[in-house]
């Protein structure tokens, strides 16, 4: 992108945490829209179509390679029941001499047995406080 003159912002930001997060978010969103077009048989997707695309998102190692992002992030599979995917975390450390972030751990699994009930409880409370009827079922 930058080599073709299409980059935005400072090229030195490439590889920084926020840059990488933006790249991953853009890739997931693009793949979800691609799924939405396939699922609904249209290039003119609406919000609910994109939701369905996200809920059928499966970016495995092969797809990461095809996208030119091998080892950039971990594979992700999103479903209606699980909007987070694997919910992994890693730790990075700033190297002041090289002026770059370095991954200092691999990816760890989150403590779903602890976190999921808290998310469910808070989500139900939010829905009740705001008069929202929680969605039931995951049919397209």
Where are these regions (language model features)?
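Sequence contexts marking disulfide-bonded cysteines in secreted/extracellular proteins
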Residues: 79-81, 135-140
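Short, cationic low-complexity segments
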Residues: 106-138
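Segments of small-molecule ligand-sensing domains
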Residues: 2-19, 30-104, 110
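Extracytoplasmic/secretory soluble proteins
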Residues: 23-27
């Amino acid at each position: 992108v930058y080599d073709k003159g299409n980059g935005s912002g400072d090229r030195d930001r490439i590889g920084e945490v926020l840059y990488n997060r933006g790249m991953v978010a853009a890739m997931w969103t693009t793949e979800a829209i691609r799924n939405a077009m396939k699922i609904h048989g249209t290039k003119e997707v609406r919000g609910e179509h994109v939701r369905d695309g996200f809920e059928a998102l499966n970016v495995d190692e092969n797809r990461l390679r095809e996208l030119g992002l091998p080892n950039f992030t971990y594979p992700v599979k999103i479903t209606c029941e699980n909007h987070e995917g694997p919910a992994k975390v890693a730790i990075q450390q700033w190297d002041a001499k090289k002026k770059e972030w370095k991954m200092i751990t691999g990816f760890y699994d989150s403590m779903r047995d602890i976190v999921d009930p808290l998310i469910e409880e808070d989500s139900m409370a939010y829905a009740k406080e705001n008069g929202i009827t929680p969605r039931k079922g995951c049919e397209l």
